């Protein structure tokens, strides 16, 4: 099999070197193309069909070579709709894989899978481009030091810390605050780490992509007045796109993130929403390419495809890519091959709870369901680990007592249990936090809380030093000193009412 070298030089070969073929067969988004003998393109080469349809409209379809069939024929998958294509149309081999613009020019802009801007803000400076198929970093380039990626969000940093260069699964239904959490992380990485973010919308609703863009403009994550000062690049391949585009849009976003890591030496946050749609698109393409399906109808190459994407997300000695991936679980079946393959790559899971959101506790991260492989004494230190374990134990005990409280009331509990409940309720409220990107909705200024401050705050609650403060004082504050100040303010307000 002729495969394209993954470190192929950027750009497209000269006109003289380009070979042309003709379309033989079209089955949905899959094209069979015949080339002259000895002029076959490599696997993953980009092919371009430029012609006019019967209504004399310009057709411009880019495809990617997937199989060499023999007899000088190749099978390619289209990255856009194949409407208007006919047998016999001319196909040009570009001589290189799909390449997309990278660098600062991508910030604040929306791209499609081909790296073309789709936001009507004019062309993008494409002097720097990278091919979307690239090798994962070599072993000697990897940074093996286990370090925490501080987000400034208390519940995440304390109970399910993110690994620098790790992969995090974000689980949550509609309306529990996934988008706001994503935007806050984008904002915090820019402020605290001087980093940038890339958002890959893979096979999700176009409306949601538009809403996210509008909210980012409103909150200042995308700076309309000075677009270069934006903190994020957006790449969309939504659910109305052909499977080829949905299968490759994740790689386009990852390629843009790799440039910031390798060339600009920055810490990058890569969001993929939704990683399941990447697998789903691969499954559709696999069937169209005539491969025998594997378990539950998925592609036989599921693990390989997932691995080739996930292994490129890593920390190197130059910088890091930390990835947060929304994971859809079909029919809530965690043993389904798609989520099961994803879980193998994750370092942490952040689970958003509808119950907490309904109580008004934001971020609505479930402190007991969210997990992280980083929460070990040798990585985070004994103080952090023991504080996190005691917080979880207190919340777990409160959860167990809730049924008794509902039936018999608080008065029937022992003195020790009543104290546990009081502290758990304070902890629950202290896990909430005002976000910078939510200032426009809440009116309260956002807070970035350093990890040391977070640990100190929870230690004070657990030690009983703050048992005298009302639980409302802990709601939507930053560090623990703000809770003490808020308690004094509340007390003064109550006195003035009397």
From Swiss-Prot:
Known EC number: 7.1.2.2
Catalytic activity: ATP + H2O + 4 H(+)(in) = ADP + phosphate + 5 H(+)(out)
Membrane topology listed for this record: Peripheral membrane protein
UniProt binding sites for ATP: 172-179
Protein name as catalogued: ATP synthase subunit beta, chloroplastic
Taxonomic source organism: Aegilops crassa
Kinase as UniProt keyword: no
CDD domains recorded: ATP-synt_F1_beta_C, ATP-synt_F1_beta_N, F1-ATPase_beta_CD
Job description of the protein: Produces ATP from ADP in the presence of a proton gradient across the membrane. The catalytic sites are hosted primarily by the beta subunits.
InterPro entries referenced in this protein's UniProt entry, alphabetically: AAA+_ATPase, ATP-synt_VA_C, ATP_synth_F1_bsu, ATPase_a/bsu_AS, ATPase_alpha/beta_chains, ATPase_F1/V1/A1_a/bsu_N, ATPase_F1/V1/A1_a/bsu_N_sf, ATPase_F1/V1/A1_a/bsu_nucl-bd
Keyword check for Membrane: yes
């Amino acid at each position: 099999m002729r495969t394209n070298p993954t470190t192929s030089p950027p750009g497209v070969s000269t006109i003289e070197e380009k070979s042309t073929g003709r379309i033989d067969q079209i089955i949905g988004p899959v094209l069979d193309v015949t080339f002259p003998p000895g002029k076959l393109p490599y696997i993953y080469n980009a092919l371009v069909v430029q012609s006019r349809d019967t209504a004399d409209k310009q057709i411009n379809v880019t495809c990617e070579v997937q199989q060499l069939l023999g007899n000088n024929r190749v099978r390619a998958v289209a990255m856009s709709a194949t409407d208007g294509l006919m047998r016999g149309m001319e196909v040009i081999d570009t001589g290189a894989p799909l390449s997309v613009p990278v660098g600062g020019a991508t910030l604040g802009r929306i791209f499609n899978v081909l790296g073309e801007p789709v936001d009507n803000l004019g062309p993008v400076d494409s002097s720097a481009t990278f091919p979307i198929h690239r090798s994962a970093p070599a072993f000697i380039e990897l940074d093996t030091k286990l370090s925490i990626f501080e987000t400034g969000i208390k519940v995440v940093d304390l109970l399910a810390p993110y690994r620098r260069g790790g992969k995090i699964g974000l689980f949550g239904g509609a309306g529990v605050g996934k988008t706001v959490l994503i935007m806050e992380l984008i904002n915090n990485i820019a402020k605290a780490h001087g980093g940038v973010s890339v958002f890959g919308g893979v096979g999700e609703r176009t409306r949601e992509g538009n809403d996210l863009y509008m909210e980012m403009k409103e909150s200042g994550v995308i700076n309309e007045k000075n677009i270069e000062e934006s903190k994020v690049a957006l790449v969309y391949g939504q659910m109305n796109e052909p499977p080829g585009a949905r299968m490759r849009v994740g790689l386009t976003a990852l390629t843009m993130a790799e440039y910031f890591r390798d060339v600009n030496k920055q810490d990058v946050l890569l969001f993929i929403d939704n990683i399941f749609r990447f697998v789903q698109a691969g499954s559709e393409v696999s069937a169209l390419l005539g491969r025998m399906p594997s378990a539950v109808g998925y592609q036989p190459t599921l693990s390989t495809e997932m691995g080739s994407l996930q292994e490129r997300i890593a920390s190197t000695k130059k910088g890091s890519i930390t990835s947060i991936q929304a994971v859809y679980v079909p029919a809530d079946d965690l043993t389904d091959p798609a989520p099961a393959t994803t879980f193998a790559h994750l370092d942490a899971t952040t689970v958003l709870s509808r119950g907490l959101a309904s109580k008004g506790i934001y971020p609505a991260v479930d402190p007991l369901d969210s997990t992280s492989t980083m929460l070990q004494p040798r990585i985070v230190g004994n103080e952090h680990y023991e504080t996190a374990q005691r917080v979880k134990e207190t919340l777990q005990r409160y959860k167990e007592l809730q049924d008794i409280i509902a039936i018999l009331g608080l008065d029937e509990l022992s003195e020790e249990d009543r104290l546990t409940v009081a502290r758990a309720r304070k902890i629950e409220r202290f896990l909430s936090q005002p976000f910078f990107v939510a200032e426009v909705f809440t009116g309260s200024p956002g807070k970035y809380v350093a990890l040391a401050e977070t640990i100190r705050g929870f230690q004070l609650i657990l030690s009983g030093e703050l048992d005298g403060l009302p639980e409302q004082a802990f709601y939507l504050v930053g560090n623990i000193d703000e809770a003490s100040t808020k308690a004094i303010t509340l007390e003064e307000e109550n006195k003035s009412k009397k």
